[in-house]
Amino acid sequence: AGEMGDNLNFLDLPGSASAITAGDGFTCSIVDDSGTDKAFCWGLNDIGQLGIENTNNVGDGSGGSMSSINNVDLVYSSQPAVVQSIDAGEDHVCAIVQYGSYRPVQCWGNGADGRLGYGSQDNRGTGAGSTNGMGSNLGYVRLSSGTTGYYHVTDIEAGAGTTCVIM
């Protein structure tokens, strides 16, 4: 009793998942997509927590279809980031990304109380543009003064409305 057994559907992700994290009504995973580890998120997306520049939910159709899933747009100088680590809070997500030898943090979703670390309460990932967009519009979180505050993060943990890192 209470077991899902053979009745549980598998998600059709674009590659093998190496990590998974869940927030309130949504899930994100690091997926090997054609040899590059990228972030993919699905579920509730009312404040941009899926990082897809809109507020449309993903994967809420019948049969677990993921046909509308796209990777989170994390780039630097037109080069896609390699996602090293990812963690979801209640309604925001932060990831350690790798660009060459650098390992900065990028966050998206609910910006209330400064939980994303960008010095504002703006939500990120809700639409295209310099304030709430992804890709080249999504900067790194400044964790301390100088360049080392951007580039040498080793671990990350997101809570309901907070995010902590180890540098």
List the predicted regions and their residue ranges.
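Residue-level signature of beta-propeller blades and closely related beta-rich strand-turn architectures
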Residues: 33-34, 45, 99-100, 111
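Short glycine/serine- and acidic-residue-enriched loop/turn motifs that recur at repeat junctions
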Residues: 1-4, 40-66, 106-135
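A short helix->beta-strand "capping" segment at the edge of beta-propeller domains
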Residues: 4-12, 67-69, 135-140
